């Protein structure tokens, strides 16, 4: 068999890049074959270096909510580039971005731009500790909050996929103040609060679990977290790197009607450029340097080209909020349709979804947390993924990642996808 261009590129890549990729899940490690190398993208399609076209349900892991290569975003980036790529100084567009978000999201009084979701989480946790004078953080098994040392505890995402529970190189001291609760289990959270004896600075949670596959919060779970944080004088941090500006313009906080003290953003806020952000209550955010004593900095934070991309996307989403209603309908058509196919075929699998995020779990038990997600048959998933890929449908190469819908996925494309699912399952 003649090697494909993707296979040849991967062969070259592994000699110079650890594992051949710059982020583990891209390696198709759970699938057992070389990853596809992508050359270009348009709308809901991506094209690999071998000339194959795929319907894409990764959306660059979430940022491309309007579809790939959206004209207005592309033009804003090109226009910004004409003025220079980076100045190392304050710019007007940073102010515009901050004002645009804070004026429209009630729980964000102030916001600070960074370069990734990981940076946003690291910073939010530092601020929470600085504000409360406490050290302990409660997180949930299966929730992924980036690759900072303190958060690599039962972290979901690529950590789950590779079968590595934590990470080498993380000293015990970095995680000894991280307390682990069970997602969707308020009792486990209250127990940790009681054990911590008033030393919990914050609870951090993916408002919708999206890195152990999609796991929706049970009714009352997020509200219960808010109440517990109030009771024990801790901050509530919503990690909205995935859900921010996706479930609603105001993210999961708006979608579920629960107000966090701090929130982290990524993905959509940068429209495909490396952008993260953290924000929230004014009295908390005023502790960030140079206004306060909690230090955080970044050479490229608030990069003008990245801000141009992100602000253009956010303005479009705010001005066209019918997109969120349409994405809900698309989610029902695709994920609801997949669930019906599973039922019609008598398969004992679970279809979880919230809005435009969805996961088909190859397990017979309802998936409500990390433990039930891990019961999935990853071998069966790998076979499903390969068959779908061969039919021109590109999904996350892991049982424990989400599918993403965009505004560019038409009903016709969704029906084409469902036809493939019928043949493959």
Where are these regions (language model features)?
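Conserved N-terminal phosphate-binding loop of PLP-dependent enzymes in the Aspartate aminotransferase
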Residues: 2-425
């Amino acid at each position: 068999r003649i090697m494909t261009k993707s296979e040849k590129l991967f062969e070259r890549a592994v000699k110079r890049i650890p594992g051949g990729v710059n982020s583990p899940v891209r390696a198709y490690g759970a699938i057992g074959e070389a990853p596809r190398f992508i050359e270009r993208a348009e709308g809901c399609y991506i094209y690999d270096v071998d000339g194959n076209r795929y319907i894409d349900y990764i959306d660059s892991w979430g940022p491309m909510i309007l579809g790939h290569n959206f004209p207005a975003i592309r033009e804003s980036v090109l226009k910004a580039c004409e003025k220079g790529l980076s100045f190392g100084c304050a710019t007007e567009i940073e102010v515009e971005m901050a004002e645009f978000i804070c004026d429209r999201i009630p729980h964000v009084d102030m916001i600070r731009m960074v370069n990734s979701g990981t940076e946003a989480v690291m910073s939010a946790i530092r601020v929470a500790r600085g504000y409360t004078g406490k050290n302990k953080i409660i997180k949930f098994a299966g929730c992924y909050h980036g690759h900072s040392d303190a958060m690599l505890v039962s972290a979901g995402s690529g950590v789950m996929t590779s079968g590595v529970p934590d990470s080498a190189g993380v000293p015990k001291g970095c995680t000894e103040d991280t307390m682990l609760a069970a997602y969707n289990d308020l009792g486990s959270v209250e127990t940790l609060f009681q054990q911590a004896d008033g030393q919990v600075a914050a609870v951090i949670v993916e408002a919708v679990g999206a890195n152990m596959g999609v796991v929706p919060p049970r009714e009352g779970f997020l509200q219960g977290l808010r109440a517990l944080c109030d009771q024990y004088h801790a901050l509530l941090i919503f990690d909205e790197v995935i859900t921010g500006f996706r479930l609603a313009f105001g993210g999961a906080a708006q979608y579920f009607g629960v107000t966090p003290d701090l929130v982290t953003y990524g993905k959509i806020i940068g429209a495909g450029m490396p952008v993260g952000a953290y924000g929230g209550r004014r009295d908390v955010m005023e502790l960030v340097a140079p206004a306060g004593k909690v230090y955080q900095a970044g050479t490229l934070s608030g990069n003008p080209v990245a801000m141009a991309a992100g602000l253009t996307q956010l303005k479009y989403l705010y001005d066209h909020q019918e997109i969120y209603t349409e994405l809900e309908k698309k989610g029902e058509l695709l994920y609801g349709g997949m669930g019906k196919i599973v039922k019609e075929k008598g398969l004992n699998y679970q279809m979880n979804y919230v809005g435009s995020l969805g996961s088909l779990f190859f397990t017979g038990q309802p998936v409500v947390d990390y433990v039930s997600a891990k019961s999935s048959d990853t071998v069966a998933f790998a076979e499903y993924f390969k068959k779908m890929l061969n039919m021109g449908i590109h999904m996350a190469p892991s049982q424990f990642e989400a599918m993403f819908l965009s505004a560019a996925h038409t009903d016709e494309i969704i029906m084409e996808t469902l036809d493939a699912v019928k043949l493959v399952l």
